[in-house]
């Protein structure tokens, strides 16, 4: 008889650092994790294309209240491009639009050339993206052969460095701001080289302060679900650790009470601006707040349970 999972009927709270495999959508991976944990509520913190793999933080239960903050986080990718070929989608899943000869490239010159892409820049989102235009996803319009004008967005490439250059394939690692489309970056690089390019492999290795070292694959997760259910719970990061790099404000019980009631409070020696984690002395993390113009802390996301 199959062992009943201890999560059944319980509220599960925490974040899983999933290593999403190639060939599955981010939502598909999310639904499988949600089923394994039998979670009532789940959400991811920034989608990866089916062609891409790597870090996909998945929030369960109360952790979903904080998922939007990781959407805003910087991200790191390992990218492999094929030079000389332009596709409809900017990656290997698309149809070939153009082919061009690739001139012999010097590694040192290409490394220097790539560094020129660092810094703030305007980027036009690709048609094959989930951005909406008049209520419709752009990729749905693209599949109908419809192209619409898209507004450029400012993104920042913090660092970009060459990792490989062989047989018309160019690899690089990029650390960038939210909203950066790697397919568009690859196309821009190919265009600047005069030969075109598209992404053939993409791996995300960092989201905010979370790196690849603590990821677990979907295959390993499903195996644990059958053989070691207790270990599943241990894989979840507590809700209070999701924004651990934020400044914390320690609060006495009275001030914590008022914040839980939705009231702003004044706390001595609190930061002068920005977001803060709310910590009640003796009880721990219970949400996040923001410093108002008059120096008070206003509650923004309150957490009512951290484990299930």
Curated annotation (Swiss-Prot):
Active site (UniProt): 49 (nucleophile)
UniProt catalytic activity: uridine(55) in tRNA = pseudouridine(55) in tRNA
GO terms of molecular function: RNA binding; tRNA pseudouridine(55) synthase activity
UniProt xrefs under InterPro entries: PsdUridine_synth_cat_dom_sf (IPR020103), PsdUridine_synth_N (IPR002501), PUA-like_sf (IPR015947), PUA_sf (IPR036974), tRNA_psdUridine_synth_TruB (IPR014780), tRNA_sdUridine_synth_fam1_C (IPR015240), TruB_C (IPR032819)
Signal peptide: none
Enzyme class, first EC level, given as a word: isomerase
EC number(s) on file: 5.4.99.25
GO BP: any one term: mRNA pseudouridine synthesis
Top-level lineage group: Bacteria
Keywords, alphabetical: Isomerase, tRNA processing
PANTHER family the record matches: PSEUDOURIDYLATE SYNTHASE TRUB1 (PTHR13767:SF2), TRNA-PSEUDOURIDINE SYNTHASE (PTHR13767)
Function description: Responsible for synthesis of pseudouridine from uracil-55 in the psi GC loop of transfer RNAs.
Recorded family membership: Belongs to the pseudouridine synthase TruB family. Type 1 subfamily.
Name of the protein this chain belongs to: tRNA pseudouridine synthase B
Protein's organism: Nitrosococcus oceani (strain ATCC 19707 / BCRC 17464 / JCM 30415 / NCIMB 11848 / C-107)
């Amino acid at each position: 008889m199959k062992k009943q999972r201890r999560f059944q009927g319980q509220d599960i709270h925490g974040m899983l650092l999933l290593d999403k495999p190639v060939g599955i959508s981010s939502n598909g991976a999310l639904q499988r994790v949600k089923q394994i944990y039998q979670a009532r509520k789940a959400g991811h913190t920034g989608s990866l294309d089916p062609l891409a793999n790597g870090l996909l933080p998945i929030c369960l239960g109360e952790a979903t209240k904080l998922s939007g903050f990781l959407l805003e986080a910087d991200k790191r990718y390992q990218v492999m491009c094929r030079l000389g070929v332009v596709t409809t989608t900017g990656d290997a899943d698309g149809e070939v639009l153009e082919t061009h000869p690739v001139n012999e490239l010097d590694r040192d010159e290409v490394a220097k050339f790539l560094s020129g892409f660092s810094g703030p820049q305007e980027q036009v989102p690709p048609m094959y993206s989930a951005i909406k235009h008049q209520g419709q996803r752009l990729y749905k319009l693209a599949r109908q052969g419809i192209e619409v004008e898209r507004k450029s967005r400012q993104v920042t490439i913090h660092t970009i460095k060459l990792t490989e250059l062989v047989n018309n394939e160019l690899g690089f690692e990029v650390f960038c701001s939210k909203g950066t489309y790697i397919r568009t970056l690859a196309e821009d690089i190919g265009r600047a080289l005069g030969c075109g390019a598209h992404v053939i492999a993409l791996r995300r290795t960092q989201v905010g302060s979370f790196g690849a070292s603590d990821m677990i694959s979907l295959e390993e997760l499903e195996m644990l679900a059958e053989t070691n259910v207790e270990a599943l719970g241990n894989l979840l990061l507590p809700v209070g650790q999701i924004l651990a790099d934020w400044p914390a404000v320690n609060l006495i019980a009275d001030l914590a009470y008022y914040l839980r009631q939705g009231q702003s409070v004044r706390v001595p020696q609190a930061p002068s601006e920005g977001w803060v984690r709310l910590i009640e002395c003796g009880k721990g993390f219970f949400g996040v707040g923001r410093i108002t113009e008059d120096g008070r802390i206003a509650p923004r996301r309150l957490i009512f349970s951290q484990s299930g």
